[in-house]
Amino acid sequence: MKTTLLFSALLLPLSVAAQTVSSPNGAISVSFSLADGGRPTYEMTYKGRPVVKPSHLGLELAKDKHATKGFAETSLMDGFTESHSEVSSFDETWKPVWGETATIRNHYNELLVSLSQDHTGRQMNIRFRVYDDGMGLRYEFPQQDSLVYFIVKEEHTQFAMTGDHTAWWLPGDYDTQEQETQESRLSEIRARFHDAVN
């Protein structure tokens, strides 16, 4: 009996260990874990050097704006446990109808993490796609009775950068997203934004 309990106790830390996925060329790595209180967290490295420090993930729902009756809880930021994770790869080449290149390669490794918020019964997936030149993530909501229709009030996705990196960004405006791509340091975006949209 003591041996069984000790073995079970040794396995417990493994269930909350970070899940990691790397780009096809291995240069970029993204790690996901649940921080204290079951808060989804990720970080990213490039060639072993930190680029994004541990950053939290989550959403806040608009109060009383969802069809799930009886649930006053609006936070999708903590209280999660990991129910499943899987890593997969994808590689395809496709031909755009219009553009500068004849073919585009869509090649990435993916980490899908399925989370369950125990006190609400809600489920949320976070999908990370890691390419040789960057990373993307998205929130997904499997069909479920405890979250049928909802409005996202706030997105709490953090990008805790490790330095004043070079960024390529699009200046968004209230009436158009069709602006030219800008290149600057992160610290220069706010000052350059007005000139970029005018």
PLM feature segments, named:
Residues 3-16:
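Sec-dependent N-terminal signal peptides
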Residues 20-198:
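N-terminal accessory beta-strand-rich subdomains and adjacent acidic, glycine-rich linkers
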